[in-house]
Curated annotation (Swiss-Prot):
Belongs to the Epstein-Barr virus BLLF2 family. The keyword Glycoprotein does not apply. It comes from Epstein-Barr virus (strain GD1). Residues 134-148 have a biased composition (Polar residues). Keywords: Early protein. Residues 1-17 have a biased composition (Low complexity). It holds the Pfam family DUF5451. Residues 38-57 have a biased composition (Basic residues). This is Uncharacterized protein BLLF2. Residues 1-86, 122-148 are annotated as: Disordered.
Length: 148
């Protein structure tokens, strides 16, 4: 059996129809229904957008502060009433500068150097790298293939 065909709703009785037609609602002229309590969505006043909640809030930016040059105070500049600044502060600054300049570059495994940060994600899936062979003699430096 076929589903029932939707029919138009029954028209209002003539007295109500006349009252509705006299009220100026051009959008309701076709359906002859009473005006809605809320206007349709496009005519409503838009609500200001709500601030979206973040599932993972943003981390605060980590600002690298510049390293101050060491303060060098000579005894002839100092007046007798002045107290000399503690020397450990300048020593810490000097140590930090030396540490930053004298430190060798950070060691990066070959996987990270070749594949970038994605290599770290793939590292657990790859087989362990073979240790270099100690038993055989050293290959000549111009040979391309390794003895392993």
């Amino acid at each position: 059996m076929c589903p029932p065909v939707r029919q138009r709703p029954a028209q209002a009785p003539p007295a109500k129809r006349q009252a509705l037609e006299t009220v100026p609602h051009p959008q309701n002229r076709g359906r002859l229904m009473s005006p809605k309590a809320r206007p349709p969505k496009m005519q409503r006043r838009p609500r200001p957008p709500v601030a979206k909640r973040r599932r993972f809030p943003r981390s605060p930016q980590q600002v690298e502060r510049p390293i101050l040059p060491p303060v060098e105070s000579t005894p002839q500049d100092m007046e007798p009433g002045q107290v000399q600044s503690p020397p450990q502060i300048t020593a810490v600054i000097q140590l930090r500068q030396e540490r930053d300049t004298m430190r060798p570059p950070i060691y990066l495994p070959a996987l990270l150097a070749n594949c970038g940060p994605a290599g770290l994600l793939r590292a657990h899936r790859l087989p362990q790298p073979k240790p270099p062979c100690q038993s055989r003699q050293r290959p000549s430096p111009d040979s391309q293939t390794s003895p392993c």
